[in-house]
Amino acid sequence: MARITVEDCLEVVNNRFELVMMASKRARQLANGVQATLDNSETEDKPTVLALREIAARKIDNALIDEVEKAERERAEREALEWAAAEVVADEDMSKNDD
């Protein structure tokens, strides 16, 4: 496994603070099951290292991170609506059985 350094990533992202924000957001996404843009089967890197590898390889940028965050938010909202609808149906079924 090639070692990833902050300097490698700073060639892609000029600001250290922006790099930290990008890497932390992406690592959180990877830890939550989002598909990586690099093959991780051989190295099995932890999400933080994998996020830095993706940044250094220019596989991700803020636009991709924001797109994934938006998709995850929409998925969570859709799931919450489905649960709420299922509860309403269950409540209606229970009230029909009480009659």
Swiss-Prot record:
One of its GO terms (biological process) is DNA-templated transcription. It catalyses: RNA(n) + a ribonucleoside 5'-triphosphate = RNA(n+1) + diphosphate. It comes from the Bacteria. The keyword Transcription applies. Keywords: DNA-directed RNA polymerase, Nucleotidyltransferase, Transcription, Transferase. GO terms for molecular function: DNA binding; DNA-directed RNA polymerase activity. GO terms for cellular component: DNA-directed RNA polymerase complex. Its EC number is 2.7.7.6. The keyword Transcription applies. It holds the Pfam family RNA_pol_Rpb6. Belongs to the RNA polymerase subunit omega family. Promotes RNA polymerase assembly. Latches the N- and C-terminal regions of the beta' subunit thereby facilitating its interaction with the beta and alpha subunits. The RNAP catalytic core consists of 2 alpha, 1 beta, 1 beta' and 1 omega subunit. When a sigma factor is associated with the core the holoenzyme is formed, which can initiate transcription. This is DNA-directed RNA polymerase subunit omega. It comes from Stenotrophomonas maltophilia (strain K279a).
